Amino acid sequence: MSKPVVLSGVQPSGELTIGNYLGALRQWVKMQDDYECLFCIVDLHAITVRQDPESLRKATLDVLALYLACGIDPEKSTIFIQSHVPEHTQLAWVLNCYTYFGEMGRMTQFKDKSARHAENINVGLFTYPVLMAADILLYQANQVPVGEDQKQHLEITRDIANRFNALYGDLFAVPEPFIPKAGARVMSLLEPEKKMSKSDENRNNVIGLLEDPKAVAKKIKRAVTDSDEPPVVRYDVQNKAGVSNLLDILSGVTGKSIAELETEFEGKMYGHLKGTVADEVSAMLTTLQERFHHFRNNEALLNDIAREGAQKARERAKATLDAVYQAVGFVSL
């Protein structure tokens, strides 16, 4: 029996954070034995916001090296760079013609990003969800690991797939969301009511995977908790967002349950919690960065992995695109 197909990807824009690691990359590693996994670096999506060309090239290879450092195995998974597979944009054009203007206008991420980048509200930003739909449908993905901020885009992907299938038969698998039960949402250190974001301009909110572990430890020790007297280390997202975020991070890094951590820190000060989180995260980053540099310093290996991954991805992508072109009436040669 064939394994379910899973596809996911990360933009090479901004340094990846511990939120990307705990919420995505580490979850992907666990999926490799049970699913047929395709993991891409979505550089086409990245240019919806202006990028420095050299920085984008460097960041793309950085992300590839981080994939490998985290344990994503090219022998088990297909790892590729989005722009190396032209079928993504070819399918996206066809899907654009089966997607309505009003549907795109309702996308909350477009509204958010266009407000932040008012000087560059481009058509690519507007149709971003259609390219994302093409990314997913091209590989007949059954499940897509998504965070809360991408659920709306997966819903429009399902709508497009169902619309196309109703017209032309069951050409596309209709994907389901895969939302992990734990580690899916790491919050900002200083503003724990909002998600940690690699694009946050206040870098004290963010734990970057490639940051100096000592600098990260200092950030964690300055993280927001609360003013309860006496201090109570308890998981309560509504009333103790900062403490809950630190517990989530510590649970993700150590593998201990929230209940175990609450018992461990019963009667202790917030400084004790912060110190433990800082030590555990610093140790994890040190190990991860050693593995990262091992791969990043071998650019020939990275290029080989990207090339082989693109070849494997294109085999699957071409089969889907050929079927779509046949369905809509294009002449084949």
Swiss-Prot record:
Cross-referenced PROSITE patterns: AA_TRNA_LIGASE_I
Catalytic reaction(s) noted: tRNA(Trp) + L-tryptophan + ATP = L-tryptophyl-tRNA(Trp) + AMP + diphosphate + H(+)
Motif 'HIGH' region: where in chain: 12-20
A biological process term (GO) from this entry: tryptophanyl-tRNA aminoacylation
Organism superkingdom: Bacteria
Enzyme Commission code(s) on record: 6.1.1.2
Keyword tags: Aminoacyl-tRNA synthetase, ATP-binding, Cytoplasm, Ligase, Nucleotide-binding, Protein biosynthesis
GO MF, any single term: tryptophan-tRNA ligase activity
Entry-linked Pfam families: tRNA-synt_1b (PF00579)
GO cellular component terms, A-Z: cytosol
Paired cysteines (S-S): none
Compartments, record wording: Cytoplasm
Residues that bind L-tryptophan: D135
Motif 'KMSKS' region, residue numbers: 195-199
Record: residues binding ATP: Q11, P12, S13, G19, N20, G147, E148, D149, V186, K195, M196, S197, K198, S199
Subunit structure as annotated in this protein's UniProt entry: Homodimer.
Family membership: Belongs to the class-I aminoacyl-tRNA synthetase family.
Known role: Catalyzes the attachment of tryptophan to tRNA(Trp).
NCBIfam families named among the record's database cross-references: trpS
UniProt name for this protein: Tryptophan--tRNA ligase
Gene that encodes the chain: trpS
